[in-house]
Amino acid sequence: MSSESESGGDFHEMREPRIEKVVVHMGIGHGGRDLANAEDILGEITGQMPVRTKAKRTVGEFDIREGDPIGAKVTLRDEMAEEFLQTALPLAELATSQFDDTGNFSFGVEEHTEFPSQEYDPSIGIYGLDVTVNLVRPGYRVAKRDKASRSIPTKHRLNPADAVAFIESTYDVEVSE
């Protein structure tokens, strides 16, 4: 059942990492025209309609009440996630400190105008965005399913070193120490 690569005998298709999802988020801090602009920008960059995020609790210092719309996000999966990362990863400088214990990582893009499809418009301004990438191995659904769920064995869990190697080889980016 196992297939071996020409360079070594340790390749196994069930151990190959893959992208489960990519979440692109813009936190504005308040609703109104700025939030509508952010939603438009997210829609143009990702090709998918964003959903509004709401405040989880009231923060008096920032004049935010629980339930107020304060941001927008888009969740990308499969080919759309791959295409977005092809565009977004060259805009960011990744470090190993951005990877968590399970191989997921996040990075920020300071200006939306860095994307090739975007140009500066003085009436809109400049917005930054956060990108979170969730990496998994085949078989992770076992831990998430409702019936007969099991924990993932330690040797099958994704670690930061495997995630860095996957990102560097797949997207031709360099992850610094």
From Swiss-Prot:
GO molecular function annotation: rRNA binding; structural constituent of ribosome; tRNA binding
GO CC terms, sorted: ribonucleoprotein complex; ribosome
Record keyword Cell division present: no
SUPFAM superfamilies: RL5-like
Signal peptide: none
Keyword annotations: Ribonucleoprotein, Ribosomal protein, RNA-binding, rRNA-binding, tRNA-binding
GO terms for biological process, alphabetical: translation
Record's function text: This is 1 of 5 proteins that mediates the attachment of the 5S rRNA onto the large ribosomal subunit, stabilizing the orientation of adjacent RNA domains. Forms part of the central protuberance. Modeling places the A and P site tRNAs in close proximity to this protein; the 5S rRNA and some of its associated proteins might help stabilize positioning of ribosome-bound tRNAs. In the 70S ribosome it is thought to contact protein S13 of the 30S subunit (bridge B1b), connecting the 2 subunits; this bridge is implicated in subunit movement.
Record-stated family: Belongs to the universal ribosomal protein uL5 family.
Subunit composition and interactions: Part of the 50S ribosomal subunit. Interacts with protein L18 and the 5S rRNA, and probably with tRNAs. Forms a bridge to the 30S subunit in the 70S ribosome.
PANTHER family: 60S RIBOSOMAL PROTEIN L11-RELATED
NCBIfam families named in the record: PRK04219.1
Protein name, entry field: Large ribosomal subunit protein uL5
Organism encoding this protein: Haloarcula marismortui (strain ATCC 43049 / DSM 3752 / JCM 8966 / VKM B-1809)
